[in-house]
UniProtKB/Swiss-Prot annotation:
Homodecamer; pentamer of dimers. It is an enzyme of class 2 (transferase). Keywords: Cytoplasm, Magnesium, Metal-binding, Pantothenate biosynthesis, Transferase. It comes from Aliivibrio fischeri (strain ATCC 700601 / ES114) (Vibrio fischeri). This is 3-methyl-2-oxobutanoate hydroxymethyltransferase 1. Belongs to the PanB family. The keyword Magnesium applies.
Length: 264
């Protein structure tokens, strides 16, 4: 696989070519994903739940994300590698710069930040300092205590309008990717069409430019439960490499996710 950059993703959006993304946490799986040509990987703070057994992502630290970023980069030198900025690691633009620097030095090509237009200044400051940003909207797991659990977001018109505004504000501030989690497919379509940057979805229908799954969900090995928006590709194929290839093909062909994985 050739080295993937944000310019490739922008080109694919313009061409209408969909792309697959998956989380990764170690060198071995990162290598497998690169060999199967997954173009974008995310070292997610989901590691707190799927690796550490925590009930949410809040305890994860910047140092832990940096460690796993180094591991993933060692296994996948050519993917576009995003790294999550953990809870309270970007409370101020200054703090965000310090912690984003650690993740970029660990091998990330981009950092992912959760939040709406209130993080626009942080996005702007990072972008001005050569740190590309993916802005995460919708169900932002670090806000689980505000939401009262892991719940679909943007169902009423006022919140939907605010999310569209958030996406456009963050793009204007310099965000190079928008990630939408657990939002109605109709809202995801509005945002995908409104934004000029690539939009990645999870639980957001099949109209976004890209899709992302947690690798443990994709392989059906999550300890607790299978989210509505996920699919066990390993059960369908019986082989990890074939499962990854099937996931990529289904995303590119627009046949994953289908209605059963989508919120209305």
């Amino acid at each position: 696989m050739k080295k993937i950059s944000i310019h490739d993703l922008m080109k694919w959006k313009q061409e209408g070519k969909k792309f697959a993304t998956v989380t990764a946490y170690d060198a071995s799986f990162a290598q497998l994903f690169e060999q199967q040509e997954v173009p974008v990987l995310l070292v997610g703070d989901s590691l707190g739940m799927v690796l550490q057994g925590k009930s949410d992502t809040l305890p994860v630290t910047t140092e832990e994300i940096a460690y796993h970023t180094r591991c993933v980069r060692a296994g996948s030198p050519n993917s576009l590698l995003m790294a999550d900025m953990p809870f309270m690691s970007y409370a101020t633009p200054e703090q965000a710069c310090e912690n984003a620097g650690k993740l970029m030095q660990a091998g990330a090509n981009m950092v992912k930040i959760e939040g709406g237009e209130w993080i626009a200044e942080t996005v702007r400051v990072l972008a001005e300092r050569a740190v590309p940003v993916c802005a995460h909207l919708g169900l932002t797991p670090q806000s689980v205590n505000i939401f009262g659990g892991f719940r679909i977001q943007g169902r009423d018109e006022a919140k939907a309008e605010q999310m569209v505004k958030d996406a456009l504000t963050l793009e204007a501030a310099g965000a190079q990717i928008i990630l939408l989690e657990c939002v109605p497919a109709s809202l995801a379509e509005r945002i995908t069409k409104a934004c000029t940057v690539p939009v990645i979805g999870i639980g957001a229908g099949n109209v976004t430019d890209g899709q992302i799954l947690v690798m443990h969900d994709m392989f059906g090995i999550s300890a607790n439960y299978m989210p509505k928006f996920s699919k066990n590709f390993l059960a369908e194929t019986g082989d990890m490499r074939k499962a990854v290839t099937k996931y990529i093909q289904d995303v590119e062909q627009g046949v994953f996710p289908v209605a059963e994985h989508t919120f209305n």
